[in-house]
């Protein structure tokens, strides 16, 4: 039986505690791209200390939110499409971020497993209660065992993963009183013009935006068949084993692979094998690559807009499944190495109006690496989170941190129900 979640207070809009500029800010070409018209939604679960005062904790969170919105005042604004439809703006008039408080009969241990359905945890962030959803919504939910779940939703077109983690760590530090706003680093930087179109016309090939034939009813399967969430943790020993397997099946002279390269390759290969796709079906693995220090000059510290492009590894089902883990890891490495300043600038041009390039969904698996964002350090005075994950586990594959095990990675992804047993078998059988 699904657990219940019930609001205990009327939802409120929290405005910045101090006056902030009343203005309209333009989002960058990367921010405005069609691919990012969705929210980033985190679920942080805390083992609350015995005897915590709920009223005091909720008041502290609300006050810290109001203070953190002063330097991050666009998160209290509202996103709108420009009159000429060339991109997005943020109207900043201190309208406020959303704040909710709820109770639930979930316990912290319920979040150690995968959810039973894609949307099982949806009510832990009830954004739909707001007529116009703010760029930031926070929900504090008290669990039946005394623990706490914090759901946080960001408008992805306003902020990226790195930026959202920097905001959350500031928000948490202010809630505990461990830091003053004036002392916190890095200071948030807007400067979205740095990733705007420069009007280039000669653009290279970008496979992430290319279309491939659907030979297998791929789109129909992922839209019509029920998806089953999975959750598997890879520890240091398992990751080392994957690296050894990859090296044993790679070309002579290859440098040792990173954990990301082998884990991404293994997940991709296992996912592909589980789906029983035609041998000639072309598959893509897309993953975000931070360009803050890849563009020239580098973006300023504290830039919290979208500063990533998609790395793209591409091959056929036949090659992906037959050539071994080393081949897969090489494809991931090659996709990473292609991204430099020129590549990033071409992506900016490609996603800008009027081109508006966007990835297709045919044959695509997308990986997002949350394990390196610092979400496991977000402490509101309740200790570090015991679980970090998504509000909804869907076909986006997430790499998540594991508490007190910095070299371990939890992998969550939802796959078609007909393939879930095969997927979990191949994940646990890397030599097969």
Swiss-Prot record:
Keywords for the protein's UniProt record, in alphabetical order: Acyltransferase, Transferase
Transmembrane region(s): none
Tissue expression: Expressed in fruit.
GO molecular function, a single term: acyltransferase activity
PANTHER family found in the cross-reference section: ACYL TRANSFERASE 4 (PTHR31147:SF1)
Entry similarity comment: Belongs to the plant acyltransferase family.
Function: Involved in the biosynthesis of volatile esters which confer kiwifruit flavor. Alcohol acyl transferase that can use a wide range of alcohols as substrate to produce esters. Exhibits acetyl-CoA:alcohol O-acyltransferase activity.
Protein name, as recorded: Alcohol acyltransferase 9
GN (gene name): AT9
